[in-house]
Amino acid sequence: MSGWYEISQAKDGQYRFVLKAGNGEIILTSELYKAKASAENGIASVQKNSSDDARYERLVAKNDKPYFNLKAANHQVIGTSQFYASEQSRDKGIESVKNNGTTATVKDLTG
């Protein structure tokens, strides 16, 4: 099964999206957006940029946990991964976003 996007609304009324792999695991999380349309535009940007390896910023957090950001052509962060136990695990996460990021399936959980 291929992955999908979910749009949800935070308690403060802002919107975010996540990209889930086919197994239901969250592999990318967006920032918070004031408008639902902005979250939808963020999804479109992931769909466009996720297959380009140059768009991934491979990082290590202060707690020494590897993670990554997916950036648009304008260098703005579109989404951020979880923290991983190793760089190898992070790189598998990037491959998962590449494989699932182009999906057109969007589940709107905002009601």
Swiss-Prot record:
Sequence repeats: 10-58, 61-109
Keywords: Repeat
Keyword flag Nucleus: no
Database matches in InterPro entries: DUF1508 (IPR010879), UPF0339_domain (IPR051141), YegP-like_sf (IPR036913)
Region called Disordered, residue ranges: 89-111
A UniProt-annotated Pfam family: DUF1508
Signal peptide (from-to): none
Similarity remark: Belongs to the UPF0339 family. Duplicated subfamily.
UniProt name for this protein: UPF0339 protein ACIAD0721
Organism: Acinetobacter baylyi (strain ATCC 33305 / BD413 / ADP1)
